């Protein structure tokens, strides 16, 4: 089963991904004393366009897991990963 299948066809894809990551975090919270990642989300734009950024920050020892999540997200969405900034998701209809 593909956990990202529900993301396809969504208008606000980063919102769906954000919720998915929160659910994932709650599932693994019992296994780790500290969270393995932290989400930062920002939205900006005007009436013509909206740009949403989503950044996944993780602890160094869990970098491999976070890199896998990053690749999965990038392959499933029309997003651009900007180093040290996060994902840029351009929504044509805000």
Curated annotation (Swiss-Prot):
Q: What is this protein called?
A: Putative uncharacterized protein YAL064W
């Amino acid at each position: 089963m593909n956990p990202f299948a529900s993301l396809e066809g969504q208008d606000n894809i980063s919102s769906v991904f954000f919720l998915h990551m929160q659910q994932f975090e709650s599932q693994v919270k019992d296994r780790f004393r500290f969270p393995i990642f932290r989400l930062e989300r920002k939205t900006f734009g005007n009436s013509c366009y909206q740009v949403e950024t989503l950044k996944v920050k993780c602890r160094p020892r869990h970098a491999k897991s976070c890199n896998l999540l990053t690749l999965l997200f990038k392959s499933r969405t029309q997003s651009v990963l900007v180093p040290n900034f996060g994902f840029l998701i351009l929504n044509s209809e805000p």
